Regions:
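Mature, Sec-exported extracytoplasmic domains of Gram-positive
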Residues: 9-10, 24-30, 124, 147-148, ...
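Secreted/periplasmic proteins that engage bacterial cell-wall peptidoglycan
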Residues: 1-2, 16, 101
Length: 218
């Protein structure tokens, strides 16, 4: 399909948008170690909390269990995400670096299945979690809501108190139904979380309406 981007190569920190990749590296470890698939019970519970509720403690536990930076960077390499990597100065998932186009590629591989980095069962499991994000975190790609539309998504937000005090506010996901089937990624920095959320909602709403209107069809 067609790809439209504005500043798609711009790099910033992932914040909680990294959590789908954290669950991915945990699933890869479980498979490599021949453990329960797609995840052992304890890690499955952590994955559910990390994705559906954006629970940071659960993401921390999965990050530690799955192998931290080396495992994350190996997944990014296997997915062909050339501008996605851990932060050399901070061994913390929130500070991993990525770009909108890399996240678009990740979502494309996750949804369409054209990757060997994750099995079909792993992809299905992760998309299932991303389709159950709690309501108050379905802004951005998931705005507006509709009972006839399915959204698999994850948002991320963090304030850079040690640098410029701006907020990184990100949203990635897949929207299908009601005549639509598209992937959308948004990354930006804003003076406040509310400003970033409102901007992502505006883009999510605009893309949803435009792609249902036929205006961009060739």
């Amino acid at each position: 399909g067609a790809v439209w981007d504005f500043g798609g190569g711009w790099a910033s920190q992932s914040a909680s948008m990294a959590k789908p990749m954290i669950v991915s590296i945990a699933m890869r470890k479980a498979r490599a170690d021949k453990l329960q698939q797609p995840l052992p019970a304890e890690q499955a519970g952590q994955a559910e909390k990390a994705i559906e509720h954006s629970d940071n403690d659960s993401a921390d536990a999965l990050w530690d269990w799955a192998g931290r930076r080396p495992a994350y960077d190996a997944l990014a390499s296997d997915l062909g995400l050339k501008d996605t990597h851990s932060a050399p100065e901070k061994d913390f998932w929130s500070w991993t670096w990525t770009t909108p186009l890399d996240q678009l590629s990740f979502m494309h591989q996750l949804v369409r299945g054209d990757t060997t980095a994750l099995t079909d069962a792993q992809r299905s499991y992760l998309l299932g979690l991303m389709g159950q994000v709690q309501d108050d975190q379905t802004w951005g790609v998931g705005f507006p809501k509709s009972g006839t539309v399915q959204v698999e998504m994850k948002n991320g937000w963090v304030q850079f108190q040690s640098t410029d005090n701006l907020w990184a506010v990100n949203s990635i996901g897949h929207v299908s139904g009601d005549g639509r089937d598209y992937l959308l990624t948004m990354m930006g920095r804003y003076p406040s979380f509310d400003a970033g959320k409102a901007y992502c909602n505006a883009i999510g709403d605009w893309v949803f309406r435009i792609l249902g209107s036929g205006e961009l069809q060739k």
